[in-house]
Amino acid sequence: MLEPKGYNEVQEFGEYEKLAPGGHVLRILKVEETTSRNGDDMIKIYLDTDKTDKQPGFFKKRYDSDTRANKKWGCIVNQLVIDTKTGLASRGLKTFHTCVEKSNSSSFKLIWGDKYAANFKNKLIGGLFRNEEYEKQDGTTGWSVKCMAFHSVGAVLEGLEVPEDKHLDNAVAPGYPVTNSVVAAPPTNDIPLPDDNDYPF
């Protein structure tokens, strides 16, 4: 066989690390105020695993190793501001705010108005992740690990129950059966951790 053109420049596949389902200590990188496809007010919350998590800087490492031209950040949570059924503030928004407050003690105070989104930058929050099945473009199915709920960092450190996998035909996973306890651990010293200047936004 002759050497194919561009062989030396092609990056080989590396070992694929998967985010462990369960609780993770997260750092909020950015919050954007926007609207959903239906025109409802919402916020987009960009997250990465914190340096104190058992898998520190997970989404940054994955983003950096992605060679596709249209790569996207791997952990963005969309949260509606108003409950479309009641017309009042959504429980999800209040839960997000409460979890940030509990996770950052005196270093966080909720500010409404023009500085609302900037208020969350670099704050900590706990996240509960689960395996979710999805349909690929070719019709086959695959699995990804998604943030399903916010918690305080304290709750993550105490250990959250790992939720059941969410299959395509399941609207809601029935409870959180104990299959494994996940507790955040200090990072190892041999992993380069990202700082604020390393993120793409």
Language model region names:
Residues 1-201:
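Short beta-rich binding modules
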